[in-house]
Design a protein with these regions (language model features):
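Nuclease-adjacent, charged terminal/linker segments that flank catalytic cores
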Residues: 1-128, 138
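Electrostatic, structured charged patches in enzyme active sites and in nucleic-acid/phosphate-binding
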Residues: 2-29, 39, 70, 135-307
Length: 307
């Protein structure tokens, strides 16, 4: 697996590109559940496949590199990248996974994105796993998929590099009212000694009309903060929000939208961007916008919890 410090990208692979579409890159045909159970009986589908399916179910859209990272964190080492490719291809052929890539007329993305298929749902439910996937999930547009991939990248970076990492949850419900419902893209809990901090992850992409969509999300967070009740949805304190942007300039663009609409969540909002997750240490990768003598400046922070 390519290490973080070996990645020399100047632009995030999860940034929005004009004219980019997603293309199906799986295998055509039908595979019955009877064929699947036969493969299980012959030990052609093992605990490794189940582990991968659980990852994909939890994180919804995921790259092979992210799968490898999760396996390594669980102490499972696949010493040859070709073995991983072969394993994933086998899971595609048996309709356990589906695969897509992003591309424009000029170029194709260097990575591919995996998601669940119906047969995987059956297998996981047989093991009493509460499967989140539904068939329409695979029809989600590029911007939604890239938002998910950026969220996953940040969570996995924290999980692998920060000793204070305690847990993560995808699409955690923060507010569930009659009219409005708010789910964080991701949710991370840090714990160090008696200190426990919750952070809601909000990935922002430069998709079409992204500013309007951001304002709608910010208003939901405003409602959540204003009506927060201790103990609801397992929260004892108001969480911080970490905005995951495409690049450094995008952090300023996101903050401008917040400031112009008086939705700054003073003291609660932090900012980072995709490529910073490749840093060896994440301690200085979060930022805040500071008001200083009638000026606003971007301030990198030194956060002990990110060591």
């Amino acid at each position: 697996m390519v290490k973080d410090n070996e990645i020399k990208a100047k632009i995030s692979p999860f940034a929005i590109k004009e004219g980019e579409i997603k293309q199906f890159d799986g295998f055509e045909g039908y595979v019955s559940i009877v064929q699947i159970t036969n493969k299980i009986d012959r030990n052609h589908i093992t605990e490794l496949e189940y582990k991968i399916l659980e990852y994909v179910d939890k994180y919804e859209f995921i790259t092979s590199r992210q799968i490898n990272m999760l396996l390594e964190m669980d102490g499972i080492h696949i010493d040859n990248s070709r073995k991983m490719v072969k394993k994933l291809d086998q899971m595609l052929k048996t309709k356990l996974l589906s695969r897509y890539y992003f591309g424009t007329l000029e170029e194709k993305a260097a990575y591919k994105v995996y998601c669940l298929e119906k047969n995987a749902k059956y297998l996981l439910e047989a093991r009493e796993v509460n499967v989140h996937w539904k068939p329409t999930d695979n029809t989600k547009p590029v911007a939604v998929m890239k938002r998910t991939l950026a969220t996953n990248q940040l969570i996995l970076a924290i999980k692998s590099k920060c000793s204070s990492y305690k847990s993560d949850e995808i699409k955690k419900v923060l507010m569930e009212g009659k009219e409005n419902k708010l789910k964080a893209n991701g949710f991370i809990t840090f714990a160090q000694g008696i200190t426990k901090i919750d952070v809601a992850v909000e990935a922002v992409r430069r998709e079409q009309n992204w500013e309007e969509k951001l304002i709608a999300r910010l208003n939901l967070y405003k409602e959540f903060y204003e009506n927060f009740k201790e103990g609801e949805n397992g929260l004892n304190e108001k969480p911080y929000i970490l905005f995951v942007c495409e690049d450094k300039k995008h952090m300023a663009e996101v903050y401008k939208v917040m400031a112009m609409n008086k939705l700054e969540f003073e003291g609660k909002a932090y900012f980072t961007y995709d490529l910073l997750q490749m840093e060896e240490s994440l301690q200085n990768t979060w930022h805040q916008f500071i008001h200083d003598e009638q000026k606003i400046k971007l301030q990198p922070l030194n956060i002990e919890l990110l060591k």
